[in-house]
Amino acid sequence: LVLLVGACSADIAPGTYFCGPEQLCPEGLTCDAVEDICTVPSQAGAFECEIPDRTGDDEPAAGLLLQPALDCVSGVRELKACLFVDDPGDWFQFSVPGNCTSAVQIEARLTYPVAYEPVAMQLSTDGAAPVVVDGECRVAATDTGGQTSRCVEVVVENGSQHAIGLVHSGALNCGGDCAFNRYTLSLQLSTAQ
């Protein structure tokens, strides 16, 4: 009786896996920073962002003012941008109307690829120092596709002024080699729950 024993290894086709945290890919593949997928090294591209970095929005007081203004109960405002290595952060300013008839909350969802440095969400209220506010989302995103989401729901005062910032987390950034990311911020005001 002859017993044949052989080792097998799975063949992983390029483009079948999204890049993991810190650009992690299966052996023999590398992260294509254009598509956020694992591919053969010869086809991997460098990180690109089609949205130019806005200058002067690097702190709460200088954030881009959202126009038109948000209502007491507003539709979702979606903002897409990138956080570059040399960019301290992107800030967006908005006000809560002073005439809301019920308590209002800020709802924000930040979505970004897991392959690069996680983006942190900070909130400054009425000119105070910003604080990190993001946490796990109560409702998971339906199509994650190599991305993750962080959320915030916070009750705020009528007539208050806010700046929401998307900043470097300082973690899982490949020792600085992937200290960048693309993101989508979905922001709205709603009746507090």
Question: Language-model segments: what does each one mean?
Answer:
Residues 8-50:
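Secreted, cysteine-rich disulfide-bonded mini-domains of extracellular proteins
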Residues 44-75:
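Predominantly extracellular/luminal regions of secreted and cell-surface proteins
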Residues 74-193:
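Acidic, Ser/Thr/Pro-rich low-complexity intrinsically disordered segments
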Residues 6, 55, 156-160:
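N-terminal regions of proteins, emphasizing targeting and processing segments when present
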Residues 12, 24, 31, 58-59, ...:
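Generic structural signal for beta-strand residues in well-ordered domains
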Residues 1-7:
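Sec-dependent bacterial lipoprotein signal peptides
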Residues 21, 32, 38, 67-69, ...:
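Generic detector of ordered, mature protein regions
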